[in-house]
Amino acid sequence: MIETFRVGRYAMRYGHFVPRLYNYCRSLGFERQRMLPSRAFCSDESQGYPVMLLAQHFGTFPFDHGRVGGKVAINRHGPYAHHGEDLVLIQASHVGYNPDDGRFGVYQRHRTEGCRFGDCCGKLCGVLRWYEDEYAHACRQVQCGRLDGEPVFQIDNQYLDDSRSEGVFLRLDRMVETPPQPLTVLSTSKVFRAGHSIRERLGEACFGETPAPIGTALSPELFHFRRALAEGPEGHDLLEAALAPVMPALVTSPHPALDAARFVTQAEFDRTYRSILREPAFATKNVLFVSGLNIDVSPREGFPFPFTKFVPWAAYARLCDGRSFLLEQEQLVETLRRMPGENPDCLSFDGT
């Protein structure tokens, strides 16, 4: 699913995206004095510049639908609907990017000692960290080797204990001959004959005479995670719950933070779309919901704000004239790019 959300040529500067979005709203019949945008962004300060652009182009400060990590507070639909007639909800997860080394997930904090780089979305990266550490440990503790010339896996006893409450759980039926019967029992591990299909996939060279960690050959289809969700002041961790089904794909990705942000955007669009369908407060309103990804590039020297790009994912419109429709990524990007890049109604903050 994550791969269907393409980035590359679909990204556009926020300074181009917002006026095009405004002009698209006007083309749908939304009126300047009745429009109220709402943003569902993370609370990170890097998201401030997009909020400023929304205020400048729509002529009013946006309502706030955002929760940490870019989750949408769908329980705010009612209050939001009472504040405007033509409603424009923009949801975006965010991820940092350092163009100097091509890393996603990082952001330079210019107001810290030493202006050091750190996680861009601390919540998203914080959720990932436990899973990344557990995966890295499993990559070391599951080893490939040979016993009497036969390809085998030497598996730490920890990963053979299904009664554990959390951690990496191997899909043994995809790794070893079934039913799993150890060839040798060692002090802290057991040795199993490797299954035929995985031997073909990994190649005979992966099974050397001296046991070696399986490493990144421990691919997503060979394991899953189990973990009790953390309980915080707002209940269970909603972001972690959303990411849990795709954690094996995320921890094995070359860009975990990017893929996590893409998946959250996809999941939030689907969830919020369904909440809009059922929201009675929207029944007499024009509603446009746009979802995407904010890519934050740290401010360069001499510039106060980040260079932020928006990657559209999908949109849904439900209008008072009875029309309703979805725009998938390709359609949405093409629609926005057809819109004028200038907004004649754009505010001058000095003049307000």
Model-derived segments and spans:
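Short glycine-enriched loops at secondary-structure junctions
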Residues: 41-46, 95
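Short, solvent-exposed amphipathic alpha-helices that sit
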Residues: 47-53
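Divalent-metal-activated hydrolytic enzyme cores
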Residues: 1-35, 59-60, 68-88, 97-352
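Short helix-loop-beta junction
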Residues: 54-64
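Short, surface-exposed ligand- or partner-binding patches at beta-edge/loop junctions that are enriched
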Residues: 90-92
